[in-house]
């Protein structure tokens, strides 16, 4: 039921990601992992939540694992993200499976994917991604 709601909102409201939890529904139109970083930073309890997202690579998958979501649908799921979801027992579905997630200009691997390429621990990934986003000027304090 929650999965259907999350997918429906993602498709019909032009959101980039949607999370349905016991606390309610969180939505965002921000790009990349920024909304996930903000929700984690807010202290929201998202354990057991269901999520729908436009693009999920290794970085986003590690953040979803860190949040404790139980199920995820991605319109585009990177193979690295799929491995993380499997490793953390997160039920998932996708529209398209991509070999890799590239940067916005399509010229290289996404910098967030690079930041977590050798990381498998979600808490460590959160710290590395927070540092990378600060470095790039994408996240304030």
Where are these regions (language model features)?
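Short, polar loop motifs at secondary-structure junctions
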Residues: 76-80
């Amino acid at each position: 039921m929650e999965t259907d709601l999350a997918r429906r909102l993602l498709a019909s409201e032009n959101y980039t990601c949607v999370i349905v939890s016991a606390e309610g529904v969180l939505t965002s139109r921000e790009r990349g992992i920024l909304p996930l970083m903000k929700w984690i930073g807010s202290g929201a309890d998202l354990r057991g939540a269901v999520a729908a997202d436009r693009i999920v690579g290794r970085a986003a998958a590690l953040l979803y694992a860190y949040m404790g979501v139980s199920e995820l649908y991605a319109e585009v799921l990177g193979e690295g993200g799929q491995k993380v979801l499997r490793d953390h027992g997160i039920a998932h579905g996708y529209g398209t499976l991509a070999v890799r997630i590239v940067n916005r200009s399509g010229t290289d691997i996404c910098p967030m994917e690079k930041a977590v390429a050798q990381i498998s621990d979600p808490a460590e990934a959160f710290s590395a991604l927070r540092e990378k986003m600060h470095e790039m000027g994408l996240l304030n304090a």
